[in-house]
Amino acid sequence: MRDFFDLYLQYTKDTEATATFHRWSAIVGIGAYLERNVWVQHGASKIYPNHYVMLLGESGSRKSAAIKGFVRILKEAGYKTLAAEKTSKEKFSADLAAMHHDTNNPDDDLLWGDLDETAITPILIANDEANDFFGLNNIEFLSLLGSWWDYNGTYEVKYKTSKSDSIPNPTPSILVGNTPTNFSLAFPPT
């Protein structure tokens, strides 16, 4: 019996993207699809299958073909929680919190204690140009995403407008592409 990766790499073998790009796209996509439904127990902690992966390659190395190809498969399988192509830290947080609001009531504000603490907030950030999503030298946004990788509980966000949001068990997965030159623009030396 052949495993999924053998079958997927056979399916993508005639594309221009490398097998490595296709394999990592599949790993991230499967992890996003599984959400927090599976885990590995690690002492008192659980390790979930969400991954943060940046495919690095020169322009024209077909990173985007691997990323977009697996995202298309996820959509066909019914996966819906994809991040916007471009956003800010604040808007991204607000969008994740809104996943737990009543979409039929635009004035719906969750009251203290009404949030299901066992709910999860999965999201796949899939962008063939990482800098379009994260911005340049946006360490605050990247740090937030870093803190969410293994976050358990409800993450509270307070905004300058005195508004606040609650994000239960944020579970982001990241699959983005970048070139070495653009990577150095996003993460300049300190």
Predicted regions and their residues:
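Phosphate-handling catalytic cores of nucleic-acid transaction enzymes
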Residues: 1-190
